[in-house]
Each structure stands twice: as structure tokens, then as C-alpha cells.
Swiss-Prot record:
Role, per record: Catalyzes the phosphorylation of pyruvate to phosphoenolpyruvate.
Residues found modified as Phosphothreonine: 416
Gene3D superfamilies referenced in this protein's UniProt entry, alphabetically: ATP-grasp fold, A domain, ATP-grasp fold, B domain, Phosphoenolpyruvate-binding domains, Phosphohistidine domain
GO BP of this protein: gluconeogenesis
Taxon lineage: Bacteria, Pseudomonadati, Pseudomonadota, Gammaproteobacteria, Pseudomonadales
Annotated metabolic or biological route of this protein: Carbohydrate biosynthesis; gluconeogenesis
Modified residues (Phosphotyrosine): 744
Cofactor(s) needed for function: Mg(2+)
E.C. number(s) listed in UniProt: 2.7.9.2
Substrates-to-products reaction catalysed: pyruvate + ATP + H2O = phosphoenolpyruvate + AMP + phosphate + 2 H(+)
Species name: Pseudomonas aeruginosa (strain UCBPP-PA14)
Keywords, alphabetical: ATP-binding, Kinase, Magnesium, Metal-binding, Nucleotide-binding, Phosphoprotein, Pyruvate, Transferase
Protein's recorded name: Phosphoenolpyruvate synthase
Keyword hit for Manganese: no
Length: 791
């Protein structure tokens, strides 16, 4: 006789057809990974045979399939009516006596005398969680169910949920035969995360598909709020190779608003067993996980990924009573892990518009169309093909119409919620967690939704033009020098790392300071003495971090380490901050500390600033961050570049200052490069090279200073050309000096990106690397290869 109920510890991946993907996976982890440190709560599962016999013995099979055969799933109203009818039939039917009895016996064994045991009752479909089909969230989950009668009712609710509107539509669209899909109910001991935290993690970056990170989201209370997208969670990125090396490996921390949490309700039966409450303001301003917990979760994720041999989508929970971290689900990631690695598809806006709303970007595409604000699932049928669907949050029930939309925008949700997962699967751009999109965007208004700018997604006014470029990158032609990239935005690092490249020739700190920090370092050093209004602004920025100075250093560490990890083990040359005084003044508190200069471009910047008494303590914070990235995290692919070194005296002083702050040339393989961007640098190249390990040519400033041009002046802008003979003479001098000394020589200015013929000339001069803007890498690479063939 076939069993109707099986203990989870008796199951493994080979049991998908008996208990569905979810329950088979839980059994696999309990059986094989407990010894490796993966904690999974115990429980039992009903079998697919139990489900089939229930439908057969109750006479439901023929009625259900007759109703489905007559249904057009694209008719949203008919779908809702048929789905509701079938679910009602299932709930009204009685379980076979043997199934009822076996559930009672299994629950008694699990409870072991604890009459008040709380369990989760989850669905597990036999076609769910297969490597090439994501049924994420299509069937129901019931949390905090107590008492065996409530468990049996919840199991029946789970069976009925196979006929949710979204599940019916999804099976039709994916070509799954309704008759071949069966359901198993998993009953699992609850992790007490209502007093702890919970969330989702992926063993790759969900947007770019970058494989060397674990991406973790978390919020307070039960994990359903994160999965549903009802809350904007905290986010963390952990670098796998660094973690495997036993070093601190957290690359990024993004503080989410975490406004609500789901906790146990007053009743213990399906539908009333949980409730949502507000989170205290103080808890919102803290990260829901400690660094140690983030690291522990990442380790468990890597163990699971290694066991399954593929990228995984994992749900986790922290028990508020015992403080332990548990894995409550694991399934194969089904979108990015199947994407082609040999064809790069890039979306590029042709024009910029007014930004109306912004949030978290899902995918890397662009969509445009008229806004359709949907406040309730009953309004779903209003969405027409090409509309931009705007809502507070999307429920998986909305899936039947989501595929009609050109883009999706929500007030709430993070990158691992259902809306995000489904949008990725459908290839539709989505911006989630916008906060107020439903108030700002108006029905019928034309907008453009762009997820092609990095972590932040933008909704622009008007339907803007955009291009889609596809390039094959599986076999790039050889060149006699390295093509590197100029990258400033850590949000784009994992994405840009997918392009053919030899590393980063210019990583700018300015973007990190501007976007991720936004506060003048002096204001953080002098926090106690700040005026009240500035202090309040700073306090909002530093939420989640222990102190103002620690915030500055850690944010620099996060930005630099993300860039270094994305391209590891390739070289990443990080340029020390090169803000001018007017740019520093624009940071919070900046006007208190910056001089007013007539021409900041030629003023207090670069090495002069670092060695000055007024800025040296700020510069030392940059040194602390770089030292942590290289020496503690072990990301020794980071090299340092010093900009705007006017004299040999400055060169000597700045190298000495770096060494005094633990960044000594040659120590732990450290190379210190000088940005060759003043005529004095090229004219005295041999002398400057005594202090540095090479040059990176900054062609923008070198051209400006050689030709006596203000590059910000429109009047003389037409004379600005890096190919001017005087500029090329200085370039040739710098290249020859570095080659003679056997030291690094590259170029990171705008010139080669704008003028591929200049890149070809540099190649002929014997330059070691050309660092380009990411959007010109492929075109320039192919142009140079063709020129080489013709030569």
C-alpha cells in the first residue's frame, strides 16, 4: 500500500514526483546537510498519491477537468469564477479516512506531547521548483497552525490552492497538463521568527546573474512579508571567494525601511493565524541581522549550492527564542542561471526625462507605456497590453495580467519578493519599493520605466526612446594591450563585470562618496559640534551604523570591495577622491569646511588636499577603508591611484603619507599608480616614476592644461581634442618613460572612449592598457581588432 504521509527525514531529491519539489528538497537537506551545518526544521509531508486518491474518491477529478477544459485563462473574470468554484468543491469534500488517520499519527509524533506546537503548512507541487520552471508562490502557505484539526483543514486549503487563478493560468502558459501536476502538503515545525527575523537569499546576484556573491534580504517577523513584497527589507551581498578564504566578506549593506512585520495571530487556524503590526522606529533604523548572522547565512547558502550543484533560491528564518538560523525552503534559481552568457543584451535610453519616482530596479531592461494604477485584484482586467502596471504591491494572484504589462511599479517590496521574481521570469522591467508611486503616477500618463541604470530604477515622465543592443561576446579577438573599464558606480559593478575586460583602469571614489555617503568627511569627524539642522540630516544618513566616522569608512569599504570583488582577481585601480572644493561643498555639511575658489578645477584638489593640515584627517579615513579592503578582506587586486600631483615634492609627501597609514608600496603586493594628467607629469616622467609604480594617463585634464582650456566653458569647447599634436607629444613621452622603466602605463581619460582612432594610436605607441567607459568597450574592441587586421 502506498503511503499517504512520509517523514521529511525519509525524503530526498529523488522523491519530487511523490512529494513535490519543495518537500523533496527539505528532506534532501535534512538527510544530507545537517552534519555540514545547515539547520532545517523537521516535519512530514502528504504524498501526491494521497492528493490523487482524495480527488478520485470524492468524485472531483472529472468535474474539475471539465471546468478547466472549457476555460479561457486569458479571460480574467472567467478564470476567477472557475477557480473559486473548484476551490470550493475541494474544501467541501472529505479526506479519505486513511489520509486523515495518517496525518493525525504523524502530527502526534512531531508534537511529542506538545499540544500547542505551531507548524507551517506549505504546498509542494510535483511540477514546482524544477530547474526550468518557477512556480514561486503559486500555492498557499499557512503559518502558526496549531492543533491537528486545524492542520488537516490547512492541508485541504493547500490542495485547493493548486487551483488558484494564478496557478491555473501559469500551468496553461507554461504548457503543464493540469492532470499531471499533483500537490503535497508539507507540515514543518515553525521557526519562531515572529520574535526574530526572516527573509530570502540567492546564491547569485538576481539582476546581473553574477555568480560570486550570496544576496540576502531580511526583515523582522515571519518571512511572508519579504516574499510577498509587503515590506522593503534590508539587503546584504557576501563575496563567496572571500568567505571561503575565511576573511570578512560582506560587500554591501542596504538598510530597508522594514515598516511592518507579520507575527502570530490570536487564532491557530488557516486565514487567522497571523497578523501584521508596525515595527518600532528604533528597530527600523537598525539592520535586522548582525554581520555574524549575515556571514552564517551565506555559509549555509554556499553549502546548499555546492550540494545541489546549481544557483539556489533559499528562504531562511531566525528563531527569536533560541537565536538560531534555520533554512525553511530551497529551490533552484530559474531565471539568471539559464540566461545566455555569450550574448549580451543591453538597454540604453536615447534621452533623459524628468524623474517622477525611483525605487529598486528589477532586471536590466526598459519599458514604456501609459500608466494603469491598480488598487485591488478585482481591477486586474483593466490592464491592457503595453500598460505600465502601478500598484501598492503585487500579489501572485495578479500574475495572469502581469505578462501584459510593459513594466511594473510598486510602492512596496524588495528584490526577492514575488513581483520581482515573476517580473524577471517574464522579462519585464520592474521597480519595487518606490514608496509613493500610486500617489504620484496618474492613470493614462505616459512614462518610461528604466532598470538600466544600476540598483536604482527610475520612472521618467513621457515615453522616451531607447535602444536594445545585442552583442556576441563568446570569442573576442586578441589585442596587443588590455581593455579595462572606467567604473564609478558599485551598483553596476556585477553587471559591467560580465563584459569582456581585463579589470578596472579607473574606479572613482567620488560616486561612492556622493551617492552612498553624501556627507562631508569633516562633518562626520566633527559630528558633536555640528549645527542642529545639519546634525539631523547626518543622523538620517548614518542609520544602521555605530558611529559617524565608522559609517564613512564602512561605506567606502562597501563601495571599494564591491568593485574589487566584481572583477576579482583582475586589477582594480582605485583613484583616491578627486572632488574639487565646490563639489565637496555640495555634500551635507560641506559649506562649513570648504573654501570658495574662483577656479576650483585648478585649486584645492588631489595631492595638495591630501597632505594639507586641513584635510589630512579626512584623507586618513580613505586610507583606513583601503587598508581594510586589501589587508582584512584580502582583496589585494586593489591598486591605488593618486590624482593631480603637481610637483615632485607632493609626490614624495603623498607616498610617505600613504605608507604612514599602512599603505606602503610593495607591502602585500601594493602598487601605487600616479595619474599623469598635468604637463609637469609628462615632462618630468622619469623623475615622477621614482615615486610610483606606473602612470595612468588622465587625458581630460592633460588636454585642458596643455591647451589652456576650461573644459566646462562652452565658448572654447570646440577646441578641446585629445588628438591635438601637443597633447599627443606629452602622451608619447609618458608612455616611453614607463616602458623604459618597465612600469605600468595605461590611460583612463575620456579620449579613447570618444575617439577609437586615438585608442589605435595609443596601441601603436606601446600603451599597456586602455580603460574605457563600459558602453564603448565592445565597439572599441572590435574597431581596434579590425584596424589590427588591416595593418
Amino acid at each position: 500500500m502506498v503511503e499517504y504521509v512520509v517523514s521529511l527525514d525519509k525524503l530526498g531529491v529523488h522523491d519530487v514526483e511523490h512529494v513535490g519539489g519543495k518537500n523533496a528538497s527539505l528532506g534532501e537537506m535534512i538527510s544530507n546537510l545537517a552534519g555540514a551545518g545547515v539547520s532545517v526544521p523537521g516535519g512530514f509531508a502528504t504524498t501526491a498519491q494521497a492528493y490523487r486518491d482524495f480527488l478520485e474518491q470524492s468524485g472531483l477529478n472529472d468535474r474539475i477537468h471539465a471546468a478547466l477544459d472549457a476555460l479561457d485563462v486569458d479571460d480574467v473574470n472567467a478564470l476567477a469564477k472557475t477557480g473559486a468554484q473548484i476551490r470550493q468543491w475541494v474544501m467541501e469534500a472529505e479526506f479519505p479516512a486513511r489520509l486523515d488517520s495518517e496525518i493525525r499519527q504523524a502530527f502526534a509524533a512531531l508534537a511529542n506531547g506538545n499540544d500547542n506546537l505551531a507548524v507551517a503548512v506549505r504546498s509542494s507541487a510535483t511540477a514546482e521548483d524544477l530547474p526550468d520552471a518557477s512556480f514561486a508562490g503559486q500555492q498557499e502557505t499557512f503559518l502558526n497552525i496549531r492543533g491537528v484539526d486545524n492542520v488537516i483543514r490547512a492541508a485541504k486549503e493547500v490542495f485547493a490552492s493548486l487551483f488558484n487563478d494564478r496557478a491555473i493560468a501559469y500551468r496553461v502558459h507554461q504548457g503543464f497538463d493540469h492532470k499531471l501536476v499533483a500537490l503535497s502538503a508539507g507540515v514543518q515545525r515553525m521557526v519562531r521568527s515572529e520574535t526574530g527575523t526572516a527573509g530570502v537569499m540567492f546564491t547569485l546576484d538576481t539582476e546581473s546573474g553574477f555568480r560570486d556573491v550570496v544576496f540576502i534580504t531580511g526583515a523582522y517577523g515571519l518571512g511572508e512579508t519579504v516574499v510577498q513584497g509587503a515590506v522593503n527589507p534590508d539587503e546584504f551581498y557576501v563575496h563567496k571567494p572571500t568567505l571561503e578564504a575565511g576573511r570578512p566578506a560582506i560587500l554591501r549593506r542596504n538598510l530597508g525601511s522594514k515598516a511592518i512585520k507579520m507575527i502570530y495571530g490570536d487564532e491557530a487556524k488557516a486565514g487567522r493565524s497571523v497578523k501584521v503590526v508596525d515595527v518600532d522606529r528604533a528597530d527600523r533604523a537598525r539592520f535586522a541581522l548582525s554581520d555574524a548572522e549575515v556571514t552564517e547565512l551565506a555559509k549555509q547558502a554556499m553549502i546548499i549550492e555546492k550540494h545541489y550543484g546549481r544557483p539556489m533560491d533559499i528562504e531562511w528564518a531566525k528563531d527569536g527564542d533560541d537565536g538560531k538560523l534555520y533554512i525553511v525552503q530551497a529551490r533552484p534559481e530559474t531565471v539568471k542561471s539559464r540566461a545566455s552568457a555569450t550574448v549580451m543584451e543591453r538597454y540604453l535610453l536615447k534621452e533623459k526625462g524628468t524623474v517622477l519616482v525611483e525605487g529598486r530596479a528589477i532586471g536590466q531592461r526598459i519599458g514604456a507605456g501609459p500608466v494603469k494604477v491598480i488598487n485591488d485584484v478585482s481591477e486586474m482586467d483593466k490592464v491592457q497590453p503595453g500598460d505600465v502596471l502601478v500598484s501598492d504591491m503585487t500579489d501572485p494572484d495578479w500574475e495572469p495580467v502581469m505578462k501584459r504589462a510593459s513594466a511594473i511599479v510598486t510602492n512596496r517590496g524588495g528584490r526577492t519578493c514575488h513581483a520581482a521574481i515573476i517580473a524577471r521570469e517574464l522579462g519585464i522591467p520592474a521597480v519595487v519599493g518606490c514608496g509613493n508611486a500610486t500617489q504620484i503616477l496618474q492613470d493614462g500618463q505616459g512614462v518610461t520605466v528604466s532598470c538600466a541604470e544600476g540598483d536604482t530604477g527610475f520612472i521618467f515622465e513621457g515615453e522616451l526612446g531607447f535602444d536594445v543592443r545585442k552583442n556576441s561576446v563568446d570569442a573576442m579577438p586578441d589585442l596587443p594591450f588590455k581593455i579595462m573599464m572606467n567604473v564609478g558606480n558599485p551598483d553596476r559593478a556585477f553587471d559591467f563585470a560580465q563584459l569582456p575586460n581585463e579589470g578596472v583602469g579607473l574606479a572613482r571614489l567620488e560616486f561612492i562618496i556622493n551617492r552612498m555617503i553624501g556627507v562631508h568627511p569633516k562633518a562626520l569627524l566633527n559630528f558633536a559640534g555640528l549645527p542642529a539642522d545639519i546634525k539631523e540630516s547626518v543622523e538620517k544618513r548614518i542609520a544602521g551604523y555605530p558611529d559617524p566616522v565608522g559609517f564613512y569608512v564602512e561605506k567606502l569599504v562597501e563601495g571599494i570591495s564591491t568593485l574589487a570583488a566584481a572583477f576579482w582577481p583582475k586589477k582594480v585601480i582605485v583613484r583616491l577622491s578627486d572632488f574639487k572644493s565646490n563639489e565637496y561643498a555640495n555634500l551635507i555639511g560641506g559649506k562649513l569646511y570648504e573654501p570658495e575658489e574662483e577656479n576650483p578645477m585648478l585649486g584645492f584638489r588631489g595631492a595638495s588636499r591630501y597632505i594639507s593640515e586641513s584635510f589630512r584627517d579626512c584623507f586618513e579615513l580613505e586610507c583606513r577603508a583601503l587598508k581594510k579592503v586589501r589587508n582584512e578582506m584580502g582583496l589585494t587586486n586593489v591598486e591605488i591611484m593618486v590624482p593631480f600631483v603637481r610637483t615632485l615634492g607632493e609626490a614624495s609627501q603623498v607616498v610617505e603619507l600613504l605608507a604612514g597609514n599602512g599603505l606602503k608600496r610593495g607591502e602585500n603586493g601594493l602598487k601605487v599608480i600616479m595619474m599623469c594628467e598635468l604637463p609637469s607629469n609628462a615632462l618630468l616622467a622619469d623623475e615622477f616614476l621614482e615615486f610610483f609604480d606606473g602612470f595612468s594617463i588622465g587625458s581630460n585634464d592633460l588636454t585642458q592644461l596643455t591647451l589652456g582650456l576650461d573644459r566646462d566653458s562652452g565658448i572654447v569647447a570646440h577646441l578641446f581634442d585629445e588628438r591635438n599634436p601637443a597633447v599627443k607629444k606629452l602622451l608619447a613621452n609618458a608612455i616611453a618613460a614607463c616602458n623604459k622603466a618597465g612600469k605600468y602605463i595605461g590611460i583612463c581619460g575620456q579620449g579613447p572612449s570618444d575617439h577609437p582612432d586615438l585608442a589605435r594610436w595609443l596601441m601603436e605607441q606601446g600603451i599597456e592598457s586602455v580603460s574605457l567607459n563600459p558602453d564603448s568597450v565592445l565597439d572599441t574592441w572590435f574597431f581596434l581588432a579590425e584596424g589590427q587586421d588591416q595593418a
